[in-house]
Each structure stands twice: as structure tokens, then as C-alpha cells.
Amino acid sequence: MQKQERLARLLEKANSLPLVPGVYIMKNTSGKVIYVGKSRKLKNRVSQYFQNGEKNVKTARMVSCVDNFDYIVCRTEMEALSLENNLIKRYTPKYNIRLKDAKSYPYI
């Protein structure tokens, strides 16, 4: 699948997400978790990744590897923060740097 088709498919999926707190899990073509993030509004945050526009080098590289994503709705931002932290520790995703070493504290 070409890059533009892949991004269009992912953006369409992202635009169907709810506007609630949650955690999103980016995966590559092998289904391996490459990034875990949290958001106050899942739809807004996840769709930003797949829209045209400026991205820093790390984000652009990560997006180029994303083939699919999952998400988990949370009741509160604090629940999302805790879940994000636990998932990063479980999967140690390539593009999550801040929480990998378990030395820094999670924040909203």
C-alpha cells in the first residue's frame, strides 16, 4: 500500500475516535508496538499524526512506520496517564523515550 493510501486509511480511522481521554497504541506492519501515547481527546490527538503538516524528525519517522493503531478509552486523564505508563513499561516501544528508563515521572 502506498504512503498516501496508508495515511488516508489511518486518518479515516482516527477521525472516527471519540473525543474522550484515552491511550493510543501505534503498531508497525508486523503488529509490533512502536509508540504509546495518551490524550485528553483521542480523536484530536491521533488524527494530528496523519494530517499534512510540519512534524519533528522523530514524529515523522514514527508515523512513516505506523501501519495500524489501537486505542483504549479511559474514564479520566489520570487513568490514561497510569495506563500509558504501564503499557510503555510492558512494551518498551521504540519511539517512547521519556518513560522507558523509568527515571522520569509521567505527567499530563
Regions found by a protein language model. Give the residues of each.
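Acidic, glycine-enriched active-site microenvironments
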Residues: M1-I108
